[in-house]
A protein has these predicted regions:
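N-terminal acidic leader/helix
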Residues: 1-32
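Short, charge-rich amphipathic interface segments used for partner binding and complex assembly
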Residues: 29-70
């Protein structure tokens, strides 16, 4: 298993990815409400932001996998 410092990094990366995921879900719900209210331009902007969150979430999840597989390690603080 990865060292404790790397395990914490992995947990932190997964937590950040989860926060982005749920923030993206919230943005998509807000975009749907805006669209229903006839504010299509604003809805499209929120959807673009939500899509960018998804891309970053995927990268963070990938980094967490690399930490888990010990391809990325965290050095102990000095």
């Amino acid at each position: 298993p990865p060292p404790k410092t790397s395990q914490q990094l992995c947990r932190d990366l997964k937590e950040a990815a989860a926060l982005l995921k749920w923030s993206g879900v919230d943005l998509m719900q807000a975009a749907a409400r805006l669209s229903e209210a006839g504010q299509e331009d604003e809805a499209k902007e929120l959807l673009k932001i939500a899509a960018s969150y998804q891309a970053v979430e995927d990268r963070l999840a990938g980094y967490a996998d690399e930490v888990r597989d010990q391809r990325i390690t965290r050095a102990k603080p000095e």
